[in-house]
Each structure stands twice: as structure tokens, then as C-alpha cells.
């Protein structure tokens, strides 16, 4: 019988786009709950991942990459990321070891200097650099502000992630178990389905298309005869030309998106899935507050 006290708390993961925040959280959770691609601003909402052991529960908040916004959607994403500073117990400031400190990192650092909670510097992607460079990178960041801890990791390979979990546990206070031990995210299945479809579009399309799409899951029902889950989803674009790209020649692209998304959705749900997708044009939806709210990007939820 153990006398160890149960610890819990909320941990925000902040950083520029593409530094590996979602990769880290998916690794810790042991399955995909945050989508990934090489496109900037892949994560748009705050994604909560729940890591529970016998002695602790850490609720990770994977935030959108902080960048200079160019539309109302971008502004929503940045405000969503910064709002986590008001609701977390620890901040992980994640940077990429293979990229030099930029104005983006400097902007985040200025905000973090005002944080009233411990800030841990996480140097990710150490597998991409020579070990001798690590000291130089850490020295550069620690010259800008004081961090409570510095932990180098490779989220992709899983290197040193256990040490980071141990470090977080040390920073957290005793607290309750906020979520059931078998729950790994607070987002509903429909949200995760939409995100998995959007991920495949990010992977398969280029130029302006990835940033111009939203996905809504309109219906999820089980077919009593086949046992399959019937999902109806809508892909929203801003231009007629973008709709043509999503559909592809003879519908090739939309079929490819559906096939790849269905595979991940079936793994997540543990059931066979029939996925039906439609493409709808909504001109300039990223700058319309009503459309943003309809598609799940409601700024009031993050204020």
C-alpha cells in the first residue's frame, strides 16, 4: 500500500507552429488526439490530452502555434493559445532545436515573462542536431529569461519524454482526479472526426487550400443492419477553385481524403465506418465571426 499523494494539474504547451507540440502530446497519450502535418497552424483549437497514472493526472493543453494573425481565424488561434496562461499550473515552452530563435519566439518569451506559473523550456527535435549544439541552444534561450527547468527531448523518437513527465509531476501540487482514468481527451468524437478529415486535406493539398478549409461532422449514426457507423461530414472552402481541388479529377481527391481519414477514424472508434463527405463554398468564412462560431472557432469560449 502506497502513501504517495495524488497530484494533478493543467499544463499548457506553447510555441511557434511546427515545433512538435502535437507530436509530443500524441506520444504521451499513446494515440492520436491532435492532428499533425508540415503545414503551419495545423492546430486551431486548444486540444486537451489527459495523462493519468496511479499517482498523477496531467491535463495537457496543446495550443495553436503562435504566429502573426492575418485574419479573424488567425486572431482566434493566437488568443486561444495565450488564454491558456490564465488557466494552467505549468507552461511548457517548446522550441525546435534545428531552428534558430526567431521574432516569434521572442514575442512568446515577452508574454511568458509575465506568467505567474513555472515555465519549463522544452528543446524538441534534438535528434536533428549534433549533441554539441545543445548547450549553445539552451544558453541562447536562458539568456532571454529564467526558466524553472530545461528539458531536451525528441517527441518523434520518444527520447527523454519520461524525464519531462517526471519534471512536470514534481511541479504539480496535490489535487483531485479531474477526469476518469480511461479518458484521454475532453473533446467529443465529432470534433476528433472533423480534425482527422482536415488532417488528410492538409497532407494532400498545397498553397492556399490547407488554410482555407474547415470541416464539420454533421451526423454520426450506427446502421443497425451492418453495424457500421455512418458519418456525414462537410468540408468548407472559400473559393470555387478550392472546391475543384478538394474534389479532384473525377472525384479522385475527395475519395483519397475519405479513404485515408476513414482508416484513422476506424482506429479511434474501434468500429467499421462509412464516411460520406460533401464540399461547400462559404466565401471568406475565416473573417466572418458567425461562420467561425458555426465551424467551432468561438473566441468567447477562450476568453
Swiss-Prot record:
<keyword id="KW-0694">RNA-binding</keyword>
<dbReference type="GO" id="GO:0070181">
    <property type="term" value="F:small ribosomal subunit rRNA binding"/>
</dbReference>
<dbReference type="Pfam" id="PF07650">
    <property type="entry name" value="KH_2"/>
</dbReference>
<dbReference type="GO" id="GO:0005525">
    <property type="term" value="F:GTP binding"/>
</dbReference>
<dbReference type="InterPro" id="IPR005225">
    <property type="entry name" value="Small_GTP-bd"/>
</dbReference>
<feature type="region of interest" description="G2">
    <location>
        <begin position="41"/>
        <end position="45"/>
    </location>
</feature>
<feature type="binding site">
    <location>
        <begin position="15"/>
        <end position="22"/>
    </location>
    <ligand>
        <name>GTP</name>
    </ligand>
</feature>
<dbReference type="GO" id="GO:0005886">
    <property type="term" value="C:plasma membrane"/>
</dbReference>
<protein>
    <recommendedName>
        <fullName>GTPase Era</fullName>
    </recommendedName>
</protein>
<comment type="similarity">
    <text>Belongs to the TRAFAC class TrmE-Era-EngA-EngB-Septin-like GTPase superfamily. Era GTPase family.</text>
</comment>
<dbReference type="Pfam" id="PF01926">
    <property type="entry name" value="MMR_HSR1"/>
</dbReference>
<comment type="subunit">
    <text>Monomer.</text>
</comment>
<dbReference type="GO" id="GO:0043024">
    <property type="term" value="F:ribosomal small subunit binding"/>
</dbReference>
<keyword id="KW-0690">Ribosome biogenesis</keyword>
<feature type="binding site">
    <location>
        <begin position="62"/>
        <end position="66"/>
    </location>
    <ligand>
        <name>GTP</name>
    </ligand>
</feature>
<feature type="domain" description="KH type-2">
    <location>
        <begin position="205"/>
        <end position="283"/>
    </location>
</feature>
<dbReference type="InterPro" id="IPR005662">
    <property type="entry name" value="GTPase_Era-like"/>
</dbReference>
<dbReference type="GO" id="GO:0000028">
    <property type="term" value="P:ribosomal small subunit assembly"/>
</dbReference>
<dbReference type="GO" id="GO:0005829">
    <property type="term" value="C:cytosol"/>
</dbReference>
<dbReference type="InterPro" id="IPR027417">
    <property type="entry name" value="P-loop_NTPase"/>
</dbReference>
<feature type="binding site">
    <location>
        <begin position="124"/>
        <end position="127"/>
    </location>
    <ligand>
        <name>GTP</name>
    </ligand>
</feature>
<feature type="region of interest" description="G4">
    <location>
        <begin position="124"/>
        <end position="127"/>
    </location>
</feature>
<dbReference type="InterPro" id="IPR030388">
    <property type="entry name" value="G_ERA_dom"/>
</dbReference>
<feature type="region of interest" description="G3">
    <location>
        <begin position="62"/>
        <end position="65"/>
    </location>
</feature>
<keyword id="KW-0963">Cytoplasm</keyword>
<keyword id="KW-0547">Nucleotide-binding</keyword>
<dbReference type="InterPro" id="IPR009019">
    <property type="entry name" value="KH_sf_prok-type"/>
</dbReference>
<feature type="domain" description="Era-type G">
    <location>
        <begin position="7"/>
        <end position="174"/>
    </location>
</feature>
<comment type="function">
    <text>An essential GTPase that binds both GDP and GTP, with rapid nucleotide exchange. Plays a role in 16S rRNA processing and 30S ribosomal subunit biogenesis and possibly also in cell cycle regulation and energy metabolism.</text>
</comment>
<dbReference type="InterPro" id="IPR006073">
    <property type="entry name" value="GTP-bd"/>
</dbReference>
<dbReference type="InterPro" id="IPR015946">
    <property type="entry name" value="KH_dom-like_a/b"/>
</dbReference>
<keyword id="KW-1003">Cell membrane</keyword>
<feature type="region of interest" description="G5">
    <location>
        <begin position="153"/>
        <end position="155"/>
    </location>
</feature>
<dbReference type="GO" id="GO:0003924">
    <property type="term" value="F:GTPase activity"/>
</dbReference>
<keyword id="KW-0472">Membrane</keyword>
<keyword id="KW-0342">GTP-binding</keyword>
<dbReference type="InterPro" id="IPR004044">
    <property type="entry name" value="KH_dom_type_2"/>
</dbReference>
<feature type="region of interest" description="G1">
    <location>
        <begin position="15"/>
        <end position="22"/>
    </location>
</feature>
<keyword id="KW-0699">rRNA-binding</keyword>
Amino acid at each position: 500500500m502506497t502513501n504517495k499523494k495524488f497530484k494533478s494539474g493543467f499544463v499548457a504547451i506553447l510555441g511557434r507552429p511546427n515545433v512538435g507540440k502535437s507530436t509530443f502530446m500524441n506520444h504521451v497519450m499513446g494515440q492520436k488526439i491532435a492532428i499533425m502535418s508540415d503545414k503551419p497552424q495545423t492546430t486551431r483549437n486548444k486540444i486537451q490530452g489527459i495523462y493519468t497514472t496511479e499517482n498523477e493526472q496531467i491535463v495537457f493543453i496543446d495550443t495553436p502555434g503562435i504566429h502573426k494573425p492575418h485574419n479573424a481565424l488567425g486572431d482566434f488561434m493566437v488568443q486561444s493559445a495565450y488564454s491558456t496562461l490564465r488557466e494552467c499550473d505549468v507552461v511548457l515552452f517548446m522550441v525546435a532545436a534545428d531552428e534558430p530563435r526567431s521574432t516569434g519566439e521572442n514575442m512568446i518569451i515577452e508574454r511568458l515573462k509575465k506568467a505567474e506559473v513555472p515555465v519549463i523550456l522544452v528543446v524538441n527535435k534534438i535528434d536533428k542536431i549534433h549533441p554539441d549544439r545543445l548547450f549553445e541552444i539552451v544558453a541562447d534561450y536562458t539568456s532571454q529569461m529564467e526558466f524553472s527547468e530545461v528539458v531536451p527531448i525528441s517527441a518523434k523518437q520518444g527520447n527523454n519524454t519520461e524525464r519531462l513527465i517526471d519534471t512536470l509531476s514534481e511541479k504539480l501540487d496535490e489535487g483531485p482526479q479531474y477526469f476518469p482514468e480511461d479518458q484521454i481527451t475532453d473533446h467529443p468524437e465529432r470534433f476528433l472526426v472533423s480534425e482527422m478529415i482536415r488532417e488528410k486535406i492538409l497532407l494532400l493539398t498545397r498553397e492556399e487550400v490547407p488554410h482555407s478549409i474547415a470541416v464539420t461532422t454533421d451526423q454520426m449514426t450506427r446502421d443497425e443492419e451492418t453495424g457500421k457507423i455512418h458519418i456525414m461530414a462537410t468540408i468548407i472552402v472559400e473559393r470555387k477553385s478550392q472546391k475543384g481541388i478538394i474534389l479532384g479529377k473525377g472525384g479522385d481527391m475527395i475519395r483519397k481524403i475519405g479513404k485515408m481519414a476513414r482508416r484513422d477514424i476506424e482506429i479511434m472508434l474501434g468500429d467499421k465506418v462509412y464516411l460520406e463527405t460533401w464540399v461547400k463554398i462559404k466565401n471568406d468564412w475565416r473573417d466572418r465571426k458567425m461562420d467561425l462560431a458555426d465551424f467551432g472557432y468561438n473566441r468567447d469560449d477562450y476568453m
